A protein has these predicted regions:
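Aromatic (tryptophan-biased) beta-strands that constitute blades/sheets of beta-rich domains
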Residues: 1-76, 81-83, 91, 101-108, ...
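Repeat-blade elements of multi-bladed beta-propeller folds
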Residues: 10, 63-92, 106-133, 160-193
Length: 205
């Protein structure tokens, strides 16, 4: 977008915790022009690429993908910066919204498939390595991390070794609490987690 245009922050996926994908801003689309472009060295690596193989129970074939939630890098924006996770180099990036300059990169041990959350100048996100992280939005330094389940065996998924409980949800922050889930296989337990957004400690509720 043109650097001279100011807009409301878009701090979470689809704007807000209700996923409204709406903003009160009024912009004239016909005057918008690209100001810069950031290009990944490789295309995104979805967790479940291609269509569903088939429905064994109903005997159906030729189904569309049911888990196509990460075909692109979903972007959030706040305080003049752009943030997004990558399934290519297992990271979250922060770019200057006016220039596209990379301000910092925070690497993880697995793909970051869902857009991060900006809250109180912190960035919250999960990764396929089974860890949720909170980093400083200015510098990208780690504030806290939380793993719902101790690391045990790893399994092969999408050409990568990952734990049984990757974090493939966003992190919803509300009332001082960060909510997220860890799950993968239907025959293994799933975890819905609530931790203190400031400290990363489990709330016990």
């Amino acid at each position: 977008l043109q650097p001279s245009i100011n807009g409301e922050d878009w701090p979470v996926f689809q704007h807000d915790n209700y996923r409204s994908a709406l903003t009160s801003e009024n912009l004239r689309a016909e005057v918008l022009e690209p100001a810069w472009v950031w290009q990944s060295p490789q295309p995104p690596q979805p967790a479940w690429s291609g269509p569903a193989k088939w429905d064994a129970y109903a005997g159906l074939r030729g189904l569309r993908s049911m888990r196509n939630y990460d075909p692109v890098f979903h972007v959030v924006s706040a305080s003049g910066r752009v943030f997004f996770g990558s399934t290519v180099d297992d990271s979250v990036r922060c770019l200057d919204a006016l220039t596209g300059e990379t301000l910092w990169i925070h690497h993880t041990d697995g793909p970051v498939r869902i857009s991060p959350t900006f809250h109180n100048n912190r960035i919250y996100f999960g990764s396929d390595d089974g860890v949720v992280r909170c980093v400083d939005a200015d510098r990208g330094t780690l504030i806290w991390s939380f793993r719902p389940k101790p690391l045990e065996r790893l399994i092969l998924n999408n050409g990568r070794l990952i734990p049984f409980w990757p974090i493939r949800t966003g992190v919803l922050v509300r009332g001082g609490t960060a909510y997220f889930a860890a799950s993968l296989l239907p025959w293994k337990e799933s975890y819905l987690c609530a931790v203190d957004a400031d400290t990363g400690k489990a709330t016990g509720g």
